[in-house]
């Protein structure tokens, strides 16, 4: 079996930065305890499990405000997906120490929404409902930001001005966003468009589109909650024309997927730890359909190998 290692794949700079911020927090003895992450720091359970070993508690809930209600003291880390001003204000009112790990690309979108609100615009925001990134973006100006996920959402959308900006969640499929923007332009011809697919998402999607077409199967390594991982599987199927499965790690690979397969493409979401992806590739490289000894699929990567290393500051 030949393995097509799609490149680039895996961690983006925003994810690495967020994890380094959280690791430094875990090592900072001056921070009030306990230390909480408001939702998953990045959408990967292996990462959140590793942080739990570091003493950092990941809390989840329907919204960031709902999660904050569970916290009465300590330190709160805002995730890479960003949060609304209301969440920041609520944390301040509760007397919590806050650390912001928002991805710079997400911050750019927040700044854009604020600037356009000041100019009297309404904003159409393309994103996934119930995902934390759109929650934070809509929360910048909930009175003028309209969240849409698919073309059907446009049918009932009415906006009381011709001053309209269209932007999007950074981890969406660039093809889906383009198609939706074309539909929006037909309904709102005066709209201005500001596509905000982050560069890391874009190049990873384009790599799958260009490199997965030679494979019989694509395996995307990524958490089920990771929107960018799910979009990579979608790109493989819809753009490259190659059947795709998303797995959290090697243990989720089903042997029947590999029957009759000669070429397997492998990629990984932007929040997927590199050792987890390497373990998937190693399994596929040694797999022999005629040798049951090669069929074992057990994740063996220790949690301490998941998180990036950080330098411990020496006391003066």
UniProtKB/Swiss-Prot annotation:
Reaction catalysis annotation: isopentenyl diphosphate + 2 oxidized [2Fe-2S]-[ferredoxin] + H2O = (2E)-4-hydroxy-3-methylbut-2-enyl diphosphate + 2 reduced [2Fe-2S]-[ferredoxin] + 2 H(+); dimethylallyl diphosphate + 2 oxidized [2Fe-2S]-[ferredoxin] + H2O = (2E)-4-hydroxy-3-methylbut-2-enyl diphosphate + 2 reduced [2Fe-2S]-[ferredoxin] + 2 H(+)
Enzyme Commission no: 1.17.7.4
Biological process terms in GO annotation: dimethylallyl diphosphate biosynthetic process; isopentenyl diphosphate biosynthetic process, methylerythritol 4-phosphate pathway; terpenoid biosynthetic process
A Pfam cross-reference name: LYTB
Residues that, per the record, bind (2E)-4-hydroxy-3-methylbut-2-enyl diphosphate: 43, 81, 131, 170, 226, 228, 271
Positions contributing to dimethylallyl diphosphate binding: 43, 81, 131, 226, 228, 271
Highest taxon above the source species: Bacteria
Pathway linked to the protein: Isoprenoid biosynthesis; dimethylallyl diphosphate biosynthesis; dimethylallyl diphosphate from (2E)-4-hydroxy-3-methylbutenyl diphosphate: step 1/1; Isoprenoid biosynthesis; isopentenyl diphosphate biosynthesis via DXP pathway; isopentenyl diphosphate from 1-deoxy-D-xylulose 5-phosphate: step 6/6
Active site residues per record: 133 (proton donor)
Binding-site residues, isopentenyl diphosphate: 43, 81, 131, 226, 228, 271
Essential cofactor(s): [4Fe-4S] cluster
Gene Ontology MF: a single term: metal ion binding
Binding sites annotated in the UniProt record for [4Fe-4S] cluster: 12, 103, 198
Keyword list, A-Z: 4Fe-4S, Iron, Iron-sulfur, Isoprene biosynthesis, Metal-binding, Oxidoreductase
Cofactor binding notes: Binds 1 [4Fe-4S] cluster per subunit.
Annotated family: Belongs to the IspH family.
Functional summary from the UniProt entry: Catalyzes the conversion of 1-hydroxy-2-methyl-2-(E)-butenyl 4-diphosphate (HMBPP) into a mixture of isopentenyl diphosphate (IPP) and dimethylallyl diphosphate (DMAPP). Acts in the terminal step of the DOXP/MEP pathway for isoprenoid precursor biosynthesis.
Name of the molecule in the record: 4-hydroxy-3-methylbut-2-enyl diphosphate reductase
Species for this entry: Bacillus cereus (strain 03BB102)
């Amino acid at each position: 079996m030949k393995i097509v290692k799609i490149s680039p794949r895996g961690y983006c700079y925003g994810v690495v930065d967020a994890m380094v911020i959280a690791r430094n927090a875990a090592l900072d003895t001056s921070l009030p305890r306990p230390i909480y992450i408001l939702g998953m720091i990045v959408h990967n359970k292996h990462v959140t499990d590793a942080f739990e070993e570091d003493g950092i508690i990941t809390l989840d809930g329907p919204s960031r405000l709902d999660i904050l209600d569970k916290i009465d003291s300590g330190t709160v880390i805002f995730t890479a997906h960003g949060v609304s001003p209301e969440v920041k204000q609520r944390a301040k009112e509760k007397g919590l120490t806050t650390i912001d790990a928002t991805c710079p690309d997400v911050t750019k979108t927040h700044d854009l929404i604020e600037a356009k609100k000041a100019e009297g615009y309404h904003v159409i925001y393309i994103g996934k409902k119930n995902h934390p990134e759109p929650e934070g973006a809509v929360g910048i100006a909930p009175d003028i930001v309209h969240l849409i996920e698919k073309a059907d959402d446009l049918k009932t959308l009415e906006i009381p001005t011709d001053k309209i900006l269209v932007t999007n969640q950074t981890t969406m499929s660039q093809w889906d966003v383009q198609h939706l923007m074309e539909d929006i332009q037909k309904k709102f011809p005066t709209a201005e468009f500001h596509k905000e697919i982050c560069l890391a998402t874009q190049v990873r999607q384009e790599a799958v589109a260009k490199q997965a077409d030679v494979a019989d199967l694509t395996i995307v390594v990524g958490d089920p909650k990771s929107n960018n991982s799910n979009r990579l599987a979608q790109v493989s199927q819809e753009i490259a024309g190659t059947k795709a499965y998303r797995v959290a790690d090697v243990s989720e690979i089903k042997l029947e997927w590999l029957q009759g397969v000669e070429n397997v493409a492998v990629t990984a979401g932007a929040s997927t730890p590199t050792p987890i992806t390497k373990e998937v590739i190693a399994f596929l490289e040694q797999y022999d359909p005629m040798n049951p000894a090669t069929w074992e699929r057990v994740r063996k990567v220790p949690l301490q190998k998941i998180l990036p290393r950080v330098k411990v500051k020496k006391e003066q």
